[in-house]
Regions:
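Conserved positions in beta-strands of structured domains
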Residues: 11, 103-106
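Mixed-charge, low-complexity intrinsically disordered regions
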Residues: 1-98, 110-227
Length: 227
């Protein structure tokens, strides 16, 4: 039993890897839709799911597949310099490139032209990512207040102040502004890049958001349409 079937695809505002939150839940304002593949569009498969506030998503790192794997990786949390064992990290570069995300269940749409759709919050998945399974989050079993977090013990708060000129922010759909600010505040740059003169771009919700970072302040410089 080594065959894993894709039961659904995620529809998110992230068309590429750069800019996606590094963990699920750190930008709770993001919204995504889970659209089921035809063999799994029976609404009965979702009976009772509306009673849960959170879900576990099991999915594939479809944009990070490699022929070979390395026993050690460089976690962004450690600045991209120190190496840790792959099984002590959540790196996408694994023997089996499978991801696990905890998301909030925002809405259940059982009857749409595409079949059942789940709207979720806080997802850290690129648009089109294959979903292999969905399970309910069970607080009594899944929450461990006494847990320790190893090298990722410290909870990270927003690292950057976001300077978003009003004229540029007005080009963003109001429904996406809070999520975009959260994405930018979490510093989407690679940990090894800190050139204040460099212009970066995050593709989000149909826009390419260009920005620079200096002295802890991220300044949005330009908004471009993604064709």
């Amino acid at each position: 039993m080594e065959t894993i079937k894709t039961i659904a695809r995620i529809r998110s505002d992230f068309p590429e890897k750069f800019g996606i939150p590094r963990q699920s839940g750190v930008v709770p304002e993001t919204r995504a839709e889970i659209v089921f593949e035809k063999p799994y569009q029976n609404p009965d498969a979702l009976r009772g799911v509306e009673g849960f506030s959170h879900l576990w998503l099991i999915w594939g790192f479809s944009a990070c597949e490699r022929d070979a794997w390395s026993p050690t990786v460089r976690p962004p949390r450690l600045g991209g310099n120190a190496r840790m064992g792959v099984f002590a990290t959540r790196s996408p570069f694994r023997p089996n490139p499978i991801g696990l995300s905890s998301v909030t269940l925002e809405e259940v749409r059982l009857h749409t032209p595409e079949g059942p759709v789940l709207v979720v919050g806080g997802a850290d998945l690129m648009d089109g990512t294959p979903i292999y399974d969905i399970k309910p989050y069970l607080p009594y079993a899944d929450c461990h207040p006494e847990a320790t977090g190893g090298f990722a013990e410290e909870k990270r708060h927003y690292a950057l102040t976001v300077d978003f000129p009003a004229a540029l922010e007005a080009q963003i759909d109001p429904a996406h502004r809070a999520a975009l600010r959260g994405v930018l505040a979490h510093d989407p740059r690679p940990s090894y890049q800190s050139d204040p003169e460099r212009m970066y771009g995050v593709a989000f919700a149909g826009k390419n958001v260009k920005f620079t970072v200096e002295d802890g302040v991220l300044t949005v410089r330009k908004i471009e349409e993604i064709s």
